[in-house]
A protein has these predicted regions:
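Autoinhibitory N-terminal propeptides
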Residues: 29-73, 131-135
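Short acidic amphipathic segments
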Residues: 119-130
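Mature extracytoplasmic domains of secretory-pathway proteins
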Residues: 51-112
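Low-complexity, intrinsically disordered Gly/Pro/Thr-rich segments
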Residues: 111-119
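Bacterial N-terminal signal peptides that target proteins for export
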Residues: 2-15
Length: 135
């Protein structure tokens, strides 16, 4: 014969484990934006609502570069996120795109520039987005 303690223990242990599992599963995950913003090698807060930076009488947009894998699917995906992007398959850029990669250059002077940059940085195949160093 099973005691009432045995029955309660038999029910409580699995129930407790289930409650613990649900509690852990409901914890917020680290924001994907935090890892995405780590890929962006400049301070987004330095840009105004129009994607410009600098003194009031000398505002300018910021050009940025990153590498994407060769292929139409990658180019189309990036272009759908950032219409300012131009691809330069013959250049490595300062960022140093490797074999099998294409240099992409975009510009912050566009609507929702910060959202665009975060969405680009959220793509697994984009490792870094940095300012273009025009000489």
């Amino acid at each position: 014969m099973i005691s009432s303690f045995g029955i309660r223990a038999a029910i409580a242990l699995p129930l407790g484990a289930a409650v613990l599992a649900v509690a852990i599963a409901c914890q917020p995950l680290a924001s994907s934006n935090s890892s995405a913003s780590d890929k962006i090698a400049f301070d987004l807060s330095s840009l105004d609502e129009n994607g410009l930076y600098g003194p009031p009488d000398g505002k300018r947009s910021l050009d940025y570069e990153f590498c994407i894998p060769v292929g139409d699917a990658y180019a189309q995906a990036v272009g759908a996120i950032d219409p300012s992007v131009q691809l330069y398959p013959q250049s490595r850029g300062r960022i140093g795109c490797g074999e099998g990669e294409v240099l992409a250059i975009g510009n912050t002077n566009q609507a929702d520039h910060d959202t665009v940059l975060i969405e680009l940085a959220n793509l697994d195949y984009i490792e870094r987005i940095q300012p273009v160093d025009w000489e």
